[in-house]
């Protein structure tokens, strides 16, 4: 059957529930009707159909309809994180050569237009009670090699890189998740993570491919989600550490009857939280993935969830993983682990093969192995344990924060001589941002926050600032950030600036 995955579901299962938003619901047939109306509307707006369109929107039915409509038109969708600053958005639009921007916020249209050389239009509203524009479905879409979505992720130097994700990548990811979690059309996946993140978009794509339903939320609200789970409105939910810690106090002692799995991503979580989940009969599936891998490529098998607390899991269907150990990795051995620690490298159909504009081509070797930059090890049973993420990447509340971005922003203040940004363990957020500074002169922490304003998004702001006499360094002069997170840090901290 040719055409889109939505067309396929609407033909085979027209009355099957596809999508929920509060008290509203759409079958696959109703969803297709709405999407076709949106496709016709956008088609009429474009003088010449673009190859790529950016979308600036938060979770909503209109965002879902817009994404699917653009795919029906054969257009690549660049998803913009709405929490970024104007400067960050402007860079992404220009780097992706995106001439059209669709925005959900009417007041933001002029602002977004000023950031691009092209045109901005307001996201369409639902065509309820109006004449639905005609649309002729396109058959030559959803091809494996076609780019479906583009998301930006920072590199280890902090420079954002565009990740083109093909329908083939998304297909491999959806089918691997289906096999691991035994997903059926009876499942309903609760999605309170942003659709502009791969964790959110992948849920929508699983629905289209596998025929399950999605209950979408504008944002995460622990009380609302607990109420829906108590009412049996979901069987699987995707959460990050912060969401899980907020939800946990609202979970009954015997858990939720309808909830099969909590898929946990977005970085580290305290083992104490996972143990509390076990006590409440919650099956937490830890996972490992990233934008470049179209969501999870490693996950715990459900039957091992309670036994392997702390592990990210085993590779999913079609994914190959190796630990590249060489001389550079020797100093990462730990007393708790006797297995060799090295860089996690991946290969498989869910993994993108390039960055936009051919950035960082060295991350793929000639055999297609992708070098993640993350450090980890495999235990005797082949379970992956991640030691550190993407060369000191901080993941706080599910958001990726690269230290280099924050460090460069801090160095704009003349009082800051050196800056080293690290992620500190945080039971609520997974990790929180801390900045260690050497100073040219005394400074109040509020002045540091004022310096960051407008340079980087608020979620990247450090929660703690430390003044250090000197940075711990290697013989070659590189800052030893791991010492700033160890007990030895007391030898370096002079004072905590924001206390």
In which residue ranges do the predicted regions lie?
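AMP-binding/adenylate-forming catalytic domain of the ANL superfamily
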Residues: 457-478, 497-499
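Conserved ATP/PPi-binding loop(s) of AMP-dependent carboxylate-activating enzymes
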Residues: 314-318, 328-363, 399-401
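Conserved AMP-binding/adenylation subdomain of ANL enzymes
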Residues: 171-188, 196-236, 250
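Conserved pre-ATP/AMP-binding loop-to-beta segment of ANL
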Residues: 14-17, 132-152, 159, 182-188
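Gly/Ser/Thr-rich phosphate-binding loop
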Residues: 235-239, 248-307, 320, 327
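Conserved AMP-binding A3 loop
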Residues: 27-29, 148-172
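Conserved AMP-binding/adenylate-forming
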Residues: 24, 39-84, 400
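AMP-binding/adenylate-forming catalytic core of the ANL superfamily
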Residues: 63, 101, 348, 353-354, ...
């Amino acid at each position: 059957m040719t055409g889109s995955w939505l067309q396929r579901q609407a033909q085979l299962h027209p009355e099957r529930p596809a999508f929920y938003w509060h008290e509203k619901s759409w079958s696959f047939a109703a969803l297709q009707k709405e999407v076709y109306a949106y496709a016709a509307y956008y088609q009429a707006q474009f003088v010449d159909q673009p190859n790529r369109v950016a979308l600036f929107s938060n979770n909503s039915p209109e965002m879902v309809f817009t994404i699917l409509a653009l795919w029906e038109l054969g257009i690549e969708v660049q998803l913009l994180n709405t929490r970024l600053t104007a400067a960050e958005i402007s860079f992404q639009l220009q780097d992706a050569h995106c001439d059209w921007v669709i925005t959900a916020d009417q007041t933001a249209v002029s602002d977004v237009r000023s950031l691009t050389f092209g045109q901005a239009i307001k996201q369409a509203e639902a065509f309820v009670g109006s004449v639905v524009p005609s649309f002729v479905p396109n058959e030559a879409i959803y091809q494996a090699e076609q780019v479906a979505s583009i998301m930006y992720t920072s590199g280890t130097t902090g420079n954002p890189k565009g990740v083109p994700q093909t329908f083939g990548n998304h297909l491999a990811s959806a089918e691997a998740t289906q096999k691991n979690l035994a997903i059926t059309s009876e499942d309903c996946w609760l999605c309170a993570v942003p659709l502009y993140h791969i964790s959110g978009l992948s849920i929508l794509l699983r629905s289209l491919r596998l025929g399950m339903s999605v209950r979408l939320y504008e944002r995460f609200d622990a009380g609302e989600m607990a109420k829906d789970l108590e009412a049996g409105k979901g069987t699987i939910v995707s959460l990050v550490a912060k969401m899980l810690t907020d939800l946990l106090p609202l979970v009954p002692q015997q858990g939720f009857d309808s909830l099969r799995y909590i898929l946990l991503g977005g970085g580290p979580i305290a083992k104490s939280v996972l143990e509390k989940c076990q006590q409440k009969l919650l099956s937490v599936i830890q996972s490992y993935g990233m934008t470049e891998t179209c969501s999870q490529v490693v996950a715990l098998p459900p039957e091992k969830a309670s036994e392997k607390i702390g592990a990210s899991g085993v590779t999913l269907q079609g994914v190959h993983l190796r630990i590249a150990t060489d001389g550079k990795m020797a100093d990462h051995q730990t007393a708790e682990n006797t297995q060799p620690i090295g860089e996690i490298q991946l290969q498989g159909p869910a993994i993108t093969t390039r960055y936009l504009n051919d950035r960082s081509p060295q991350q793929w070797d000639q055999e297609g192995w992708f070098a993640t930059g993350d450090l980890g090890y495999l235990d005797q049973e082949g379970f992956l344990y991640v030691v550190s993420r993407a060369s000191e990447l901080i993941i706080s509340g599910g958001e990726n924060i690269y230290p280099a971005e924050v460090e460069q922003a801090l160095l704009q203040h003349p009082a800051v001589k050196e800056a080293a940004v690290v992620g500190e363990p945080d039971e609520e957020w997974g990790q929180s941002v801390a900045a260690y500074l050497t100073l040219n002169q005394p400074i109040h922490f509020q002045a540091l926050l004022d310096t960051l304003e407008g340079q980087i998004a608020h979620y990247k702001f450090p929660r703690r600032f430390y003044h250090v006499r000197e940075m711990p360094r290697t013989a070659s002069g590189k800052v030893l950030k791991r010492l700033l997170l160890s007990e030895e840090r007391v030898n370096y901290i002079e004072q905590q600036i924001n206390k």
